[in-house]
C-alpha cells in the first residue's frame, strides 16, 4: 500500500468534467502518474469508458490503448469511476477488481465519485473518496494536503467545499489523518471555462479533428469541441457563441473545406473580434493546405506561425501545449 497519495488539481478537474458531463451514466477512467517517495502522485487522467445507468467497466482493450498514450515516465497508477446519485462506496465487484490490481501493483489507487453531490457549499469528502482493499474489505483513504505552499499542513477533506463553478476549494485549516492526499491547483487560467475552442469544418472531423480533440483532452486540457459539448436540442449559434466567450484560445483548423464553409468562418470572426480587444487567442493549424492557399483566404492568418498536420497529430498537440504552458507561466 502506498504511504501517501497526491493528486493534482488538474486531475481532479478532469474527473469532474468527465463524470458531471455524463449525467446519469456511469463512467470510468484511468489515473496516470508515477511513484514518488514510497507513495503515488496522480498527475492526470485518461477517460476510457461510458457505461449505463447501472454498470461500467474498463476493458482490456481500453487499458491497452491508454498505455499507448502514456508519455515517457508516466504509469497507470489507478482507476476511477462514478456513481451518480448513489453516494461513494466500493461494491463487491469493485473490491474484487481492485484486489486483482493490487496483485500486480501494490500502489494502485481507486477513486469513487458521486458527481450529483458536487454542488455549491457541499464538502468534497461527500462525493469524492479514495479506496484501497485490505482483507477483502474496502478501506477509505482520508486526509488532504495542500502542496506548493509554505504551510505544509494537513487538511480535512470536509474543509474542501464546492464553489459556484462546481470545483472544490479549501477554506479552513484543520489537522487530518494518516495517508495523505495532496490537492494542487493547476496553473491554467481559471477565469475561463475552457482552455481551447476548436474551430473546424465538419468534413475534417473523421481523419483529424476528432483525434486532435481527444488527444488534447487526454493531456488535461478543457476542450470546447462540439461532439464533447453540445447536446440534443441545444441552440447551435448560442452554444457556439457561449463557447467562444468562455475559451482562452481558439484552435482554427484551416483546410480547403474550412474555406468553403460559412459556420467555421463565423466562428473565426468571433475569435478575430477577441483579438481586436488586444488578446492573442488564435492558434492556427494548417491541414492539407499550402501557404499560398491560406494567403488567398487571409493574409493575416498566412503570416501567423502555424502548426501543420503534415508533421503528425502528436506534433500539433505538443505545439499547442507548448503555447498554453508558456502563457500560463
UniProtKB/Swiss-Prot annotation:
GO MF annotations, alphabetized: metallopeptidase activity; NAD+ nucleosidase activity; NAD+ nucleosidase activity, cyclic ADP-ribose generating
Gene3D superfamilies assigned: Cytidine Deaminase, domain 2, Toll/interleukin-1 receptor homology (TIR) domain
Stored SMART domains: JAB_MPN, TIR
Record's keyword annotation contains Transcription regulation: no
Effect noted on mutating residue 267 to A: Loss of NAD(+) hydrolase activity
InterPro entries to which the protein is assigned, alphabetical: JAMM/MPN+_dom, JAMM_MPN+_peptidase_M67A, MPN, TIR_dom, Toll_tir_struct_dom_sf
Any Gene Ontology biological process: NAD catabolic process
Residues of the active site: 267
Record remark: domains: The TIR domain mediates NAD(+) hydrolase (NADase) activity. Self-association of TIR domains is required for NADase activity.
Identification of the protein by name: NAD(+) hydrolase TcpA
Source organism per UniProt: Theionarchaea archaeon (strain DG-70-1)
Source species taxonomy: Archaea, Methanobacteriati, Methanobacteriota, Theionarchaea
Amino acid at each position: 500500500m502506498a504511504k501517501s497519495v497526491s493528486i493534482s488539481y488538474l486531475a481532479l478537474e478532469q474527473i469532474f468534467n468527465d463524470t458531471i458531463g455524463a449525467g446519469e451514466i456511469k463512467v470510468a477512467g484511468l489515473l496516470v502518474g508515477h511513484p514518488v517517495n514510497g507513495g503515488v502522485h496522480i498527475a492526470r487522467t485518461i477517460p476510457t469508458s461510458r457505461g449505463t445507468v447501472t454498470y461500467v467497466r474498463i476493458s482490456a482493450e481500453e487499458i491497452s490503448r491508454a498505455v499507448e498514450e502514456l508519455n515517457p515516465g508516466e504509469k497507470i497508477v489507478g482507476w476511477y469511476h462514478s456513481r451518480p446519485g448513489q453516494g461513494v462506496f466500493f461494491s463487491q465487484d469493485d473490491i474484487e477488481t481492485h484486489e486483482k490490481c493490487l496483485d500486480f501493483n501494490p500502489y494502485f489507487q481507486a477513486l469513487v465519485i458521486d458527481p450529483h453531490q458536487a454542488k455549491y457549499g457541499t464538502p468534497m469528502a461527500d462525493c469524492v473518496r479514495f479506496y484501497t482493499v485490505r482483507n477483502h474489505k474496502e478501506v477509505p483513504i482520508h486526509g488532504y494536503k495542500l502542496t506548493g505552499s509554505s504551510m505544509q499542513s494537513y487538511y480535512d477533506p470536509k474543509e474542501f467545499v464546492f464553489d459556484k463553478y462546481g470545483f472544490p476549494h479549501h477554506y479552513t485549516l484543520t489537522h487530518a489523518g494518516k495517508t495523505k492526499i495532496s490537492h494542487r491547483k493547476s496553473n491554467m487560467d481559471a477565469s475561463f471555462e475552457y482552455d481551447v475552442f476548436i474551430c473546424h469544418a465538419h468534413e475534417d472531423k473523421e481523419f483529424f479533428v476528432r483525434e486532435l480533440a481527444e488527444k488534447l483532452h487526454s493531456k488535461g486540457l478543457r476542450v470546447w469541441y462540439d461532439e464533447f459539448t453540445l447536446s440534443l436540442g441545444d441552440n447551435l449559434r448560442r452554444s457556439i457563441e457561449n463557447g467562444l466567450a468562455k475559451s482562452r484560445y481558439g484552435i482554427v483548423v484551416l483546410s480547403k473545406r474550412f474555406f468553403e464553409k460559412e459556420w467555421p468562418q463565423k466562428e473565426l470572426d468571433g475569435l478575430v473580434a477577441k483579438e481586436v480587444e488586444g488578446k492573442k487567442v488564435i492558434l492556427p493549424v494548417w491541414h492539407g493546405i499550402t501557404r499560398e492557399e491560406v494567403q488567398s483566404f487571409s493574409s493575416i492568418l498566412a503570416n501567423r506561425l502555424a502548426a501543420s498536420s503534415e508533421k503528425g497529430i502528436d506534433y500539433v498537440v505538443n505545439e499547442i501545449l507548448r503555447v498554453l504552458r508558456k502563457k500560463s507561466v
